[in-house]
């Protein structure tokens, strides 16, 4: 499970500012 999630972490972290910007 983590072997699948770890490669996605940089993408998820990079998308956080976009989500915050969309909420604002």
UniProtKB/Swiss-Prot annotation:
GO molecular function: toxin activity
Domain of life: Eukaryota
Protein family according to the UniProt entry: Belongs to the grammistin family. Group 1 subfamily.
Function: Thanks to its abundant amphiphilic alpha-helices, it may integrate into membrane phospholipids, leading to lysis of the membrane. Its hemolytic activity is inhibited by phospholipids, but not by cholesterol. Has antibacterial activity with a broad spectrum against various species of bacteria including both Gram-positive and Gram-negative groups. Also has ichthyotoxic activity.
Disulfide bonds: none
GO terms for biological process, alphabetical: defense response to bacterium; killing of cells of another organism
GO annotations of cellular component type: extracellular region
Major location category of this protein: secreted
Oligomer and partners: Exists as aggregates of 3-4 molecules.
UniProt protein name: Grammistin Pp 4b
Entry's localization field: Secreted
Alphabetical UniProt keywords: Antibiotic, Antimicrobial, Cytolysis, Hemolysis, Secreted, Toxin
Tissues expressing this chain: Expressed by the skin glands.
